[in-house]
Amino acid sequence: MPYPNAMTVKLNHTIVHSVDKRAAADFFAGVFGLPAPKPFYDFLDVEVGNEVTLAFLDADGMEIQMQHYAFLVSEKEFDQIFGRVKERGLDYWADPGRKEKGRINRHFGGRGVYFQDPSGHLLEIITRPYEGA
């Protein structure tokens, strides 16, 4: 552990601003094979595991800045998720700059791919954590 006196901090939830929270939450749950979104106040929550929830919220006319969300998945989960990406006819890239269209990367002996959600956020699935990340 590089910081022996550091506190243990876990991400619990984050808000994902969306053009249409229903479309975005349904898209995410569908592509990732997760349970249907659950309403919570003004949000639609999708539980992604590890006690983390993505809380989708309508941006209500505010400009949405693209965010990047990376998910570490098993080889089997990668195949399932990537299969759904291709079934939906989504564009995908090997890089975050979206220059290597239609390719996957093989960083650190794993596989990784980027694709966008309906609001333009860049989603990434990887099978190995990036060293130094």
Regions found by a protein language model. Give the residues of each.
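Core segments of cupin and vicinal oxygen chelate
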Residues: 8-9, 15-54, 58-60
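Vicinal oxygen chelate
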Residues: 71-118, 122, 130-133
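N-terminal beta-strand motif that seeds the catalytic metal site of vicinal oxygen chelate
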Residues: 2-22, 69, 128-133
